[in-house]
Amino acid sequence: VAMILGDLGATVVHVDPPGGPLWQSPANATLNRNKLIVNIDLKVPEGVEQARALIGEADIVIENFRPGKFAALGIDFGALRGERPELITLSIPGFASNDQERRELRAYESVIAASSGVFTDMGLNRVLMGVNPSFSPLPLASAYGAMLASSSAVLALQSRERTGLGDHVEVPLASAVMEGLCYNSIKIEGLPDRYITQREREIARRRVEGLPMNLSYEELQELLDPFYRSYLCKDGRMFYVVCPSHKNHAKRCLQALGIYEELVAEGLTEEQDTYLPTAEWQSDVSLGVYPLPKDWADRIAAKMKEVFLTRTAKEWERIFGRGRFPGAPQRWLQEWINDDHAETSGLMIDVQDPEYGTMIQPGPVVWLEESGEAALSPVPRRWVDVSTALSLLKKQKTKLPRVTDPDDRSGWLEGVRVLDLCNVIAGPHSVSYLARFGAEVIKLDPASPLYDSWNTVIFGISHMRGKRSALIDIKSVEGRKALHALVQSVDVIVWNAPDNQIREMGLDAETLGKINPDAIFCKLDCFSGVSRGPRTDYVGYDDLVQASTGIMTRFGGSMHEPEEHAHVGTIDVMCGFGGALGVATALYQKLNTGRVGRGRTSLSANSGLLQIPFCYDYLGRGLFNEPSGRYVPGYDALTRFYYTASGDYLLFSSNEHDIPSLDALEEFKGIASLPKDERDAFLSGIFAGDTSPAW
């Protein structure tokens, strides 16, 4: 959270215990850039006084202890805000302070994931393969929590510019991951058959007939939609196509592959209005609607397989990108870190770290167009004494308005009008998030939708909350007038569109400045960084970024068997929170300086945060050997799944610091003297001796 705020220009002091961070990783170089690091012992009175002195000069204070732990150390947020009502305090516990069952758990990432059901809901592929639970090393809870916490902190900050009052915010990581995966958790009774995919049908069939879930990877591929799967290319690399649900993308794809006319001749049709019940369609299939019937899916996929073998993945990437339909090669993370586009766009940046030297790190997650360049050259982490840090904080003067109502409980965004032009998940979720804090949101959709009802209606159950909606044909004269009037009436405009489309709509900085000079514009897209790169204008979705940045190859375990991570929206919701942070930052800048800005984020920028434990490179770095593949049980013997006597699995979460304590227990006696490579077998035997509830 503080790294994200530091990238946006905040002065950050980070407190570590005397022995340094508990988590020893090169990723700390990224997490602590733009920070002064001080070592303080919060378990002694002197350390508490030092911390209180630093807090006395801060605008925002962030802690991630278990609920009540910080107060027990002598730093009570409630008391501090009683003394300084302008202070913003942010708590990020693993489990909520009112979760009486779990609040005291040592809530490491894997514990939160196991408790929240993440490892038992890792996608339809894993269900059909019979892999359950399924481990993932991605820190989903921390990544979602970081974006929720940073956006809420800045929303509270901009609200303080109007009221003079701070606030207390709690972002439990377990709650964050539940919202982050909300698009995987939609269950509708009586859902029409048109929305049920081939994989879902196969799962239901096997459950009814009592058949095992034991499909191979190859068998699974034949259950995928042809516009939502990977294809083998001439160079042996897989290429991921993501062209379902859109009126034009699937058609452009088939035309580029040279098989569109052939398929039309065979009977492939396009319905004029796919929102009608399928019983009223002229045919049983409509190109651009997800999912396709199996007979058509098989026929189209067979032809696509043949054509993809005629070119390399890189060639196809250029064809898809320039043709304005989504597709990308499957890459490993190491390839993405050193990719030309990642470098030139600022999605990956060089930082001169004092320990690792020149280090490639993820670029900023969120930035403002007018000042984003500064975030490409962060100051490396620096260790200082407390007096130096305190002196720097004192130099930062805060001017606040006079408090007129000390009991003000209005929403952070009350009185702010937002125009939502977004589609799919990330953009609409961003604005729905703003609505919960009091923003008045107007959602504008085309009268003739480009996306099918799977995208607009099903996903809209979540992201349409808190909005008023209008359907307008903006290509007509009257429609353009209506859009113009709406643009003039709002404070904020949010859209996930490429720059050329933004210019066509008159929402570029110059044109918007003439229509509504006070309006803040926020853009979300697929491949943008602070600077332009060769793929900046390529269109794409969450899954495409998973493919491009190495998430799918890690999850599947190999280049030839990449897998989508979970179902949908793994990065989308993070990016949505990033869009909200962009809006909040621009609002704060406007209130603080009068400058009207343009917020930016992208799915690719958020992928760096999601992979932050592994997303770095430097000379001398070891192998990129993060846990990968469908059968990996965990990180190591101390953090992994173990089979128990009750016939299920237990997530054991420990570390090297715990070895003496474990060795003191009768059940684990002898673990301290074991070589590390013998721990798995030792612990497997122990956990198999009793049930999960007993453990």
Residue ranges: model-predicted function:
Residues V1-L165, K314, V384-R595, L619, ...:
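N-terminal helix-loop segment corresponding to the beta1-alpha1 unit
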Residues T11-V12, G321-W336, V441, W695:
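Short, well-structured beta-strand/strand-turn elements
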Residues G94-A96, L173-E179, D235-R237, P244-N248, ...:
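Glycine-rich beta-alpha junction loops
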Residues V111, S136-V154, L173-S185, R194-T197, ...:
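Mid-domain beta-loop-alpha active-site segment that forms a flexible
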Residues A156-E218, Y228, W332-L333, A586-R630:
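Substrate-binding/catalytic subdomain of NAD(P)-dependent oxidoreductase enzymes
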Residues R205, L211-M213, Y217-E218, L232, ...:
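Terminal low-complexity tails and localization/encapsulation signals of metabolic enzymes
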Residues Y217-L223, F227-G323, L638-W695:
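Aromatic-enriched alpha-helical interface/lid elements that frame and gate functional surfaces
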